[in-house]
């Protein structure tokens, strides 16, 4: 093992030596010492101290300003080493001994150089200055001639031999070129080589200065001459400069050849040393294999020790478990003792109070008796004195004293009787105190019974108050008022909780807001809503109040819930929740989860189908959040109530079966939603998010259907631009958000004033909410406010808007239920539409083939019979009437109602009657209609090509059957026929284009595709 450790230490020392050599080659490339050099080779390079001085000057330029020649005495070499050691000592670094450099171990020298490298590199990183060190070691120049040695790039003598350079001793007789003149030539500025005299160039050539010059200097001379030739206009160079350039290039080529030869020799040396290291490695492997048995024995002993250690640890764990169990038992006993002590202290305090009262009474009696006894004792003392005086005075008066003794005896008896009476009176006083205590207890019990009566009366008052609130809510529901729930956001971490604008939150929806800038009565304002949630209300508490409203969706009612408030007030927190954990679920997740639970409990009586749409309104554009298409087309909005309840029919509708499906879709929608960072909120919603849940129910027993629609809307926050510090895209988003919220305020104001015209078309948001705000739906609004003082103005404006919303009466909501007969009727109408679409397609194909041979006024069929082109208009008119009757049956009240946007609406008058095909397509794209089958002008005329075909007969039979059923179902309860909307008399006759547009709308429109989604 000892030999292995020694070899390892030797390898480690070799690695450190190679690291120092690599650093020296990078710092002084002219030496180029091989990396696998031994300690002797490194000592040979560093022994004269010249390289050490060059290292100091290279790391800290100017510290030792002196040239060191290749030929110097041993004393000068020792002086160079001492200078290096002095510089290292002044830097506060460990040095080495001169003997180590001469014949000792080189480990100290290697460590010193590594520490010097690390110190200088760390000093350069820290930006420390070396100016004091330079000033301290600045050596004045001497008059001795400088031999161009290592300072000008000359290597040491040993290195000269290895590199094949001529020995400097053979060049002692050559003329020595002064170093200062050499620097003058090599440091000439651009454009001055041509002015260099020939005598100086010849002197430099004959003095052999090019052999001693550094390679970098020679390259700089070449570059300078070439640059000067380029800058000259004619490119002429003097012959002396050309000669100088040739000599410099030859010198560079010679050095490159020498360097290549040196590299080849070094490769041979490296190969031999690599073989030597391989042999050493094999020897080390043999040594390692020999120690395997010892290692196995040590491993066995270690395994036994580990087993004993594991046993000890198990015992220690058992002991710790016993200690923990005893500690728990001790804690339980201590808690029991503490509880008993508390009970004992309570009982002791009660007894002490009673005892103090009794002791006070007894003390008073004792004091009174003590005074009486003292008086008796004083009388006894006086009597004894008198007896003694009488006995001492005269025995003659004994008889007199005997008489007096009898008198005193009687007096003592009377005094004893008096003391006995006092004792009896004390006992009577105690009995009176006991009687008083009993009376006090009776009075306390009577007081408790009276207090209980008061508590019962207060509970009855709260019950009556709750009943009144329930009746008020029922009245509000009958009126169709928008329910308004207010939720106060809690303070964020770091905010001052004392500076709040919310002064009071009542149990019945009262909210008192204080103005921090005003005092007195003017600084407070009271608001009244259906419910106010405090900052400490949980998500479950918020949902429990709106749960009955959401459950009515399964009964066929339309419900709309939207959150309104400024940016950062918690709208998304209320609607979606901060995370997908069940505890933090918002209204969206809880509503869908509740719908699935109820549908599961009713599965024996009803069958429900649930579909989810999720869109957003971003910069007045409707985008589908559940679509995989990134470059989405613009989605349209239906401004009228459709039979299938779809407001945005082109948005993707995803059927869901469980809560997990909803969570996956909501994650996709939240990831696609537009959010951004503002000064008010790090993740601010930059769009209006609309989650629509479509529920279709089927009664298993009677086959009737119900359709409910739940809109869960998370509005973007209203914000002031100066507070949000929005710029660029954020400013544009804020402008669109404020514009849409302003349009919503205009709609609410018009509804509150009951105006005939309600501006729903001013914004995409109000178009989506038209079906909810326009009546026939249960609507609820969450108002989110910030309690901090800085948001006071936004809070007041938000609450004023909510107060205006709470006064809007929408009318009683209606259930969208359809009987079994109506369902069959709708299915027959859908099949009839499909038949007409197929027939029109066939007619269009045949018409294109026969257009050239047909007359403009009549169309000839295959058998030669002719008939008018508009013979198919009867079929289309019946289809139009059927569609109108269908809308009456599915929604009887909406047929007679007047659209708040300016007039009555139905399917037949959605399309303008005075527009051509291009105008209709433009308007349809603006209003959100997606076009169906495109009919040409000849399509209407081609309806008479096959008048006696089987398809016509089947269609006529279906129309007659549907018309009879419509006539039967259109009667009211009193047996009177239902009134239909009168047709305007001044309507212009329909053109073929108008007929084509209406047939396209009725047969191939997006309403047909949307209705089929629920029939799959």
Curated annotation (Swiss-Prot):
SUPFAM superfamilies: Calponin-homology domain, CH-domain (SSF47576), P-loop containing nucleoside triphosphate hydrolases (SSF52540)
Coiled coil recorded as keyword: yes
GO biological-process terms attached to the record: microtubule-based movement; microtubule-based process
Domain annotation Calponin-homology (CH): ranges: 14-121
One cellular component (GO) term of this entry: microtubule cytoskeleton
The UniProt record lists the keyword Transmembrane: no
UniProt xrefs under PROSITE patterns: CH (PS50021), KINESIN_MOTOR_2 (PS50067)
Record-listed ATP binding positions: 565-572
Disordered: annotated span: 123-176, 884-912, 971-1016
Span of domain Kinesin motor: 481-808
Keywords: ATP-binding, Coiled coil, Microtubule, Motor protein, Nucleotide-binding
InterPro entries in UniProt: CH_dom, CH_dom_sf, Kinesin-like_fam, Kinesin_motor_dom, Kinesin_motor_dom_sf, P-loop_NTPase
Coiled-coil boundaries: 288-354, 820-852
Polar residues biased stretches: 884-893, 990-1004
One Pfam family here: Kinesin
Molecular function, one GO term: ATP binding
Family: Belongs to the TRAFAC class myosin-kinesin ATPase superfamily. Kinesin family. KIN-14 subfamily.
Protein name: Kinesin-like protein KIN-14K
Lineage of the organism: Eukaryota, Viridiplantae, Streptophyta, Embryophyta, Tracheophyta
